[in-house]
Design a protein with these regions (language model features):
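ABC transporter nucleotide-binding domains
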Residues: 2-8, 13-204, 208-210
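Generic structural signal for individual residues within well-ordered alpha-helical segments
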Residues: 75, 97-98, 112, 167, ...
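Non-catalytic alpha-helical coupling and interface elements of nucleotide-dependent molecular machines
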Residues: 102-105, 242, 295-296
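Short low-complexity, flexible loop/linker segments enriched in glycine and/or proline
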Residues: 201, 292-295
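Conserved beta-strand-loop-alpha-helix hinge in the C-terminal portion
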Residues: 207-228
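Short, charged/small-residue-rich alpha-helical element at the C-terminal edge
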Residues: 222-293
């Protein structure tokens, strides 16, 4: 894995007796899109707020770009959108970013580059209050892009958007990663994370349950076989792949984690005298994996 730009070790946040974030150990590699996945109230936003120095951890440590959260060296290298964008409704999109750029000592080129990259250059002089929700979210990302930071931390950037707005935001995030930004993206939208993220951390009730690539999290693909009669086909399949790999389900025979066995399985079923109705690769969705992991939480 590439060098880590975000590292936490035992990161914990307590509010009285309530533990909002519990011993989280995460790694975000430079250049990747990292999906921080969990249901509402899982501890995602609290974790992000600790990473940017907005709140102090109760225990544990975090480093961002090699420094403690909130350090001046970190502030210059990260762009943040947490809990929705906040702008002056009576100012234009351009003027809102101009206020932020001036505060940070940035010039006109930075401002115009940010507007262009989020696709708002042609609407930049419209008042913020006239923007659609999707445009407001994109302006928020534009604000995070001021100064071309190495790391973007985006908290639920598609929350509340319609399907078109969600698609546009996914395209934008993918393009930003292609331009060399690392993106730490929190979301409860499983399909969104599966589609654009390189690696995923799954959090539930404050605990980080898993951290891996999307492919690793979903696991090896399986085969699904339907045949008649099943009482003939099932023993034939087990004879090829073994008892543990073949599972009889309501939808057919699921063959887990045995690559390259499809031809042999098909022959065995037919030779046993059963009619082979269907044999296809069946991959678990991230949604299925997520619910399996969090159902006991």
């Amino acid at each position: 894995m590439k060098d880590s730009i975000v590292v936490t070790d035992g990161l914990t946040k307590r509010y009285g007796e309530h533990i909002a974030v519990d011993d989280v150990r995460m790694r975000v590699a430079a250049g990747e899109i990292y999906g921080f996945l969990g249901p509402n109230g899982a501890g995602k936003t609290t974790t992000l707020r600790m990473l940017v120095g907005l709140i102090r951890p109760s225990a544990g440590t975090a480093t961002v770009a090699g420094h403690a959260p909130g350090a001046p060296a970190v502030v210059r290298r990260i762009g943040v959108l947490i809990e929705g964008p906040g702008f002056y409704p009576y100012l234009s999109g351009r003027d809102n970013l101009r206020v932020l750029a001036k505060y940070r000592g940035l010039g006109r080129d930075d401002l115009e580059d940010a507007l262009d990259r989020v696709g708002l250059a042609d609407r930049a002089d419209d008042k913020f209050r006239t923007y659609s929700l999707g445009m407001k979210q994109r302006l928020g990302v534009g604000a995070a892009l001021l100064g071309r930071p190495d790391l973007l931390i985006l908290d639920e950037p598609t929350n509340g958007l319609d399907p078109q707005g969600m698609a546009e935001m996914r395209e934008l995030i993918t393009a930003l990663a292609g331009d060399g930004h690392t993106v730490l993206l929190s979301s409860h939208m499983l399909s969104e994370v599966q589609e654009i993220c390189d690696r995923v951390g799954v959090i539930s009730h404050g605990k980080l349950l898993a951290e891996s690539t999307v492919a690793e999290l979903r696991g090896a693909s399986s085969l699904l076989l339907r045949a008649e009669p099943m009482e003939v086909a099932f023993p034939a399949v087990r004879g090829v792949v073994g008892e543990r790999a073949a599972i009889l389900t309501a939808s057919g025979i699921r063959i887990e984690g045995v690559d390259g066995t499809a031809p042999a399985v098909a022959r065995a079923v037919i030779d046993a005298g059963a009619d082979l109705l269907e044999l296809r690769r069946d991959e678990r969705s991230l949604e299925e994996v997520f619910f399996e992991m969090t159902s006991g939480q």
